[in-house]
Design a protein with these regions (language model features):
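Membrane-embedded segments
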Residues: 86-186
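Short, Asp-centered acidic motifs that coordinate Mg2+ and/or phosphate
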Residues: 117, 151, 185, 201, ...
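Binuclear metal-dependent hydrolase catalytic cores centered on His/Asp/Glu-rich metal-binding motifs
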Residues: 162, 182-184, 197-262, 272
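N-terminal membrane-anchoring alpha-helices
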Residues: 2-82
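Catalytic metal-binding/acid-base residues of hydrolase active sites
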Residues: 95, 125, 157-158, 192-193, ...
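Conserved beta-sheet core of the metallophosphoesterase superfamily
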Residues: 269-329
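Active-site-proximal beta-strand elements of phosphoester/diester hydrolases
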Residues: 85-95, 200-210, 263-267, 329
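Acidic/histidine-rich helix-loop elements
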Residues: 61, 88-104, 124-133, 160-171, ...
């Protein structure tokens, strides 16, 4: 019988080299083909663990981009009803990060919230030096709440807010501070009085309540005179600023009374000994609330109340790598 030259003489002859590359001939008595040996178990386990780690990191990144607002009512004894319900939006440790285009995730989380003022407690720029997310946040907050006051303090990882090392750029203030000011945020360098129906609430830093005013006055005046004699515009601007906030702090302390409400902003939470060592009647001893950053926990909407009979902690999952100890107060 005539066969075409190209026709296979055996069923196995029809396998291409690509098919047979994964097989080898068996010993006589076995099957004609058998698979090559599989990868060792240890290698497969290692690959599985690496894939699991990558999946965990991806999940953590996604979770850390999720924005949720915790609402906390703070009871303050003997607070006048005029201040009842005064609400602070507390944000900290942005660290130069963006949450969606133009901080859209933060906007979505805050769009139905009502607040009277915003406090930013440090590390908003951090060592990254990227201030644009902070600027976008400030602009977005003003769009949500036109005219809302925004107060900020630096964190331990932020560039110094003022230093003569910035003088080459034409100002002794850090570029991130100048940019935030232009967008309507205020660096809290002296106590700020917030008044409702003749009753006062003070926003301050705890350090401003324990300054040796007379010693610092002498020091700042001497620095100012030296700057004038040196005719350095940046040095004059910085020393004049120091004298200004010291004078404003002195005037504020003269107005403070025992009936006022005191809220301190700080980045690193004060030590227990620092708070316990505040004697009755001292300005530091008057503090009703301390708002801190540093531990990168929740963002809070704090509502003041004189009638709150209980305290509620609102917790949420914020990723696999979060602070070791939750901070409450």
């Amino acid at each position: 019988m005539n066969r075409r030259p190209s026709q296979s003489r055996s069923g196995f002859d029809s396998f291409s080299p690509q098919h047979t590359a994964h097989f080898k001939a068996a010993q006589p008595g076995d099957e004609f083909f058998e698979p090559r040996p599989r990868a060792p178990l240890g290698r497969r386990v290692l690959v599985f663990l690496l894939l699991l780690l990558l999946a965990a990191l991806a999940a953590n990144l996604a979770i850390n981009q999720f924005v949720q607002v915790a609402r906390v009512t703070v009871p303050i004894r003997k607070m006048d009803s005029a201040l009842e319900g005064y609400t602070l939006l507390h944000i900290s440790d942005l660290k130069g990060a963006s949450y969606g285009a133009n901080q859209s995730r933060i906007r979505f989380a805050l769009q139905k919230e009502d607040f009277d003022a915003v406090v930013l407690t440090g590390d908003m720029v951090s060592s990254r030096g990227n201030a644009q997310p902070l600027y976008t946040l400030i602009e977005m907050l003003h769009e949500l709440k036109p005219g809302v006051p925004i107060y900020m303090i630096p964190g331990d990882k932020d560039p110094l807010p003022a230093s003569m090392s910035y003088a080459a750029s034409g100002s002794p203030f850090a570029p991130w501070v100048l940019g935030a000011r232009r967008r309507g945020a205020q660096l809290l360098s002296a106590p700020v009085r917030i008044e409702r129906d003749g009753h006062a609430l003070w926003l301050t830093t705890s350090a401003l309540l324990s300054l040796d005013m007379d010693t610092m006055q002498e020091q700042f005046e001497r620095q100012y005179l030296d700057a004038l004699s040196g005719d350095d515009e940046n040095a004059i601007e910085l020393t004049a600023y120091n004298l200004q906030w010291l004078t404003e702090t002195r005037d504020a302390r003269a107005q403070m009374t025992d009936e006022d409400v005191y809220i301190a902003l700080t980045h690193v939470p004060p030590a227990d000994e620092e708070l316990e060592g505040a004697y009755a009647g001292s300005l530091r001893g008057r503090l009703h609330l301390v708002l801190c950053g540093h531990y990168q926990g929740d963002w809070f909407v704090c509502r003041l109340s004189a009638r709150c009979l209980f305290r509620r902690r609102i917790s949420r999952f914020t990723g696999f790598f979060r602070a070791k100890t939750p901070i409450t107060g």
